């Protein structure tokens, strides 16, 4: 496993973003782990988050994009910090773009924030976590309505590796529907592999009991 992946897993634990216990997802699934990206709150945390995304982007995509798009709402600050990190770390200077939930009818009108989307633009979408893919299904029509725009990829922080609308994962379903490449900074398989019986800040994060519960969860909800 690459060093940046290990660092990112510990970073999520330190920020209280990745936790283990008893949770219920929006879809009603009882899950033994939860990823709450709303816990990235400080400037230093957001800066580091952008850097991890930039590393994943650099590892998985050529420089064949000119817009980083973050779906509202969490994707708005995410798209900004990712574009800054790409510039700082790799000298890749691209624009950010996000959508509003409501169309603005005064001042800077329209549904987009940041850069406008024009014919020929190549867009890389950044999202926090995709369980069902709902936000991307909502976002793609907005992007496509702007003109002849090519969406080249989707980058998320954690691939939960769960069933989407069918038996396949949400990311695979999105890839098949829209024809782009997706990637994650880490997968839950990598998270479990790295944290199982490992101490982080003096505490074992995934012990035998939690590991068993995770295994049982994926027997029922894991993507085929």
UniProtKB/Swiss-Prot annotation:
Protein's pathway: Pyrimidine metabolism; UMP biosynthesis via de novo pathway; UMP from orotate: step 1/2
Q: State the coiled-coil residue ranges.
A: none
Q: Keywords on this record? A: Glycosyltransferase, Magnesium, Pyrimidine biosynthesis, Transferase
Extract the GO molecular function terms from the UniProt entry.
Answer: magnesium ion binding; orotate phosphoribosyltransferase activity
Q: Which residues bind orotate?
A: 131, 160
So where does 5-phospho-alpha-D-ribose 1-diphosphate get bound?
Answer: 26, 73-74, 100-101, 104, 106, 127-135
Q: Enzyme group, top EC level?
A: transferase
Q: Which cofactor does it need?
A: Mg(2+)
Name a single GO biological process: 'de novo' UMP biosynthetic process
What's any one GO cellular component for it? Answer: cytoplasm
EC number(s) stated in the UniProt entry for this protein: 2.4.2.10
Q: Which Pfam families match?
A: Pribosyltran
Q: Which reaction does it catalyse?
A: orotidine 5'-phosphate + diphosphate = orotate + 5-phospho-alpha-D-ribose 1-diphosphate
Report the function annotation for this chain.
Answer: Catalyzes the transfer of a ribosyl phosphate group from 5-phosphoribose 1-diphosphate to orotate, leading to the formation of orotidine monophosphate (OMP).
Please describe the quaternary structure of this protein: Homodimer.
Tell me which HAMAP family the record gives. PyrE
Similarity remark? Belongs to the purine/pyrimidine phosphoribosyltransferase family. PyrE subfamily.
Q: What is the name of this protein?
A: Orotate phosphoribosyltransferase
What is the phylogenetic placement of the source species in the record? Answer: Bacteria, Bacillati, Bacillota, Clostridia, Eubacteriales
